[in-house]
Amino acid sequence: MSSAGGGGGRGKSKGSKSVSRSSKAGLQFPVGRIARYLKAGKYAERVGAGAPVYLSAVLEYLAAEVLELAGNAARDNKKNRIVPRHIQLAVRNDEELSRLLGAVTIAAGGVLPNIHQTLLPKKGGKDKADIGSASQEF
């Protein structure tokens, strides 16, 4: 009367495959690894079951957001490969990401192109005759 393999008992049957917590949550980021890091980091005495899943989801969302914007920046520059410069442009041109990563320095990222308003040429309606005659009057 014992169940040999797939019967009505509790627990796993012998033929069942283990399913990762990442796949259960529908995530690409590793839930188990993040749980291990949370436990080893001594951030708290105990770590709840949902905490690493939630943190994995947040990290995956942020990574996807940055990669999407960096891919757009690479495409705008007619490149197929994302380099640190594209990540820098993506982060600094997005208001929320720029605020979140304000104190972060991206290696080989460069700076945003910016020319101060006072250094730009004036858009006045003067023609060339007016410019030359004004400097000659004493």
UniProtKB/Swiss-Prot annotation:
Start-end of Gly residues biased regions: 1-10
An annotated Gene Ontology molecular function: structural constituent of chromatin
Residues annotated with Phosphoserine modification: S135
Annotated keywords: Chromosome, DNA-binding, Nucleosome core, Nucleus, Phosphoprotein
GO CC terms in record: nucleosome; nucleus
Subcellular location: Nucleus; Chromosome
Pfam families linked: Histone, Histone_H2A_C
Modification(s) after translation: Phosphorylated to form H2AXS139ph (gamma-H2AX) in response to DNA double strand breaks (DSBs) generated by exogenous genotoxic agents and by stalled replication forks, and may also occur during meiotic recombination events. Phosphorylation can extend up to several thousand nucleosomes from the actual site of the DSB and may mark the surrounding chromatin for recruitment of proteins required for DNA damage signaling and repair. Widespread phosphorylation may also serve to amplify the damage signal or aid repair of persistent lesions.
SUPFAM superfamilies per UniProt: Histone-fold
Sequence motif [ST]-Q motif, location on chain: 135-136
Stretch list, region Disordered: 1-24
CDD domains for this protein: HFD_H2A
Function in brief: Variant histone H2A which replaces conventional H2A in a subset of nucleosomes. Nucleosomes wrap and compact DNA into chromatin, limiting DNA accessibility to the cellular machineries which require DNA as a template. Histones thereby play a central role in transcription regulation, DNA repair, DNA replication and chromosomal stability. DNA accessibility is regulated via a complex set of post-translational modifications of histones, also called histone code, and nucleosome remodeling.
UniProt comment concerning the protein's domains: The [ST]-Q motif constitutes a recognition sequence for kinases from the PI3/PI4-kinase family.
Name assigned to this protein: Probable histone H2AXb
Highest classification ranks of the organism: Eukaryota, Viridiplantae, Streptophyta, Embryophyta, Tracheophyta
